[in-house]
Amino acid sequence: MMRKGLFFLFFLCATGCWVYAQDASPDTTLNGEVKERFDDGKVKSEKNYHHGQLNGPFREYYPNGNLMSVGSYKNGQLQGAYKSYYEDGSEYFEKNYIGGQLYGTSREYYENEVPKSVENYYYDALNGFNQYYYPNGNLKMAMNFKKGKLNGISREYNEDGSLKNEINYDDDHIDGVSKEYASDGSLYAIWNYKIDQKDGPSKTFYNNGQVQWEMIFQNGNLEGPSKKYAQDGKLTLEANYKNNQFEGVVKEYQANGNLKSECSYADGKKDGECRQFRDNGKQWLEWNYKNNLKDGVAHEYAPQGYLWMEVNFKDDVKNGIMKEFYDNGALKQQWIIEDGMENGPSKSYYKSGEVMTEEVYHNGRLNGVVHLYHKSGDLAYIDTYQDGVKLSRQTSSK
């Protein structure tokens, strides 16, 4: 963005100067001073010619009579100081030419006479230290050029005067260490560049100076190990990148330092085992992924650490057998899942293993007859359900 803006400024200058320097079909009979007038007779311009070519001083005026520009030509080309003014008489710019080419220091002003730019040229090419300003007078950009190409450190500032970035250039390419700053003036990032692309180790920071993210770039892409931190310096994420995407195991950490999650990735997608943990470090959830979709057996663990639920996934949807367990590992209940909903017969069990209920589900709701048993195995109740609503209960005669 910064380089494009600079190019635009240079383009305007080059275009404006070109208009004055060119004369496609000179009238070779013109000699001496030539005056051009507005319709009301006021002088519009005063120019000097020699054998049809502009030579000597010239002046141009606004319709109100104020001076628009003043300069000099030699053999049809701008030579020496060239100044231009706004219609109210305030200075617009001052430039210097040698043989029609910009040379030396050029200055441009806003209409309130606040400096807009100070540029240095060497035969039409920006050269040396150049400065650009906001309308409030604060410095906007300070850039170093060598024969028209950016070289060395260039700095960009916010309108309030605080530093925005420092960029190192080599032969018109961003190269080496560049820095970005937050609006409060604190260092936000340190980037390494190689020929306009981020390349090598880089860091971002919180405004308290603590490292926020450590990463490595290669040819503009995130590659290799990366770490993220909280403002207090505690590790929050460990990841590996390949071509800007997660690759391998990604780990997240809780504020207390315990592992929050770890998941395997391939080509930026979850692939393989993923686990999530509770604040106390005990495992909570466990899934298997294939191409970023849950696939295979998944487990959920109770806060006490024992296996609580087991379910099968296919293409990110529950399908197959789902089981619930007691804290002693005994089966508590089992369902058949189809497209994410309970369907078909289900049984629940006492902790000691005896059958507690026999149920039937349809589209995720109890339907039909439900048998409830005593621990002894004797039938206790017979309930009737429709779409999850109990319609009746019959006490067993046994």
What do the predicted segments below correspond to?
Residues 1-2:
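N-terminal secretory signal peptides that target proteins for export/translocation
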Residues 5-14:
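Sec-dependent N-terminal signal peptides
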Residues 17-398:
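Glycine/tyrosine- and acidic-biased, solvent-exposed loop/turn segments at the edges of beta-strands
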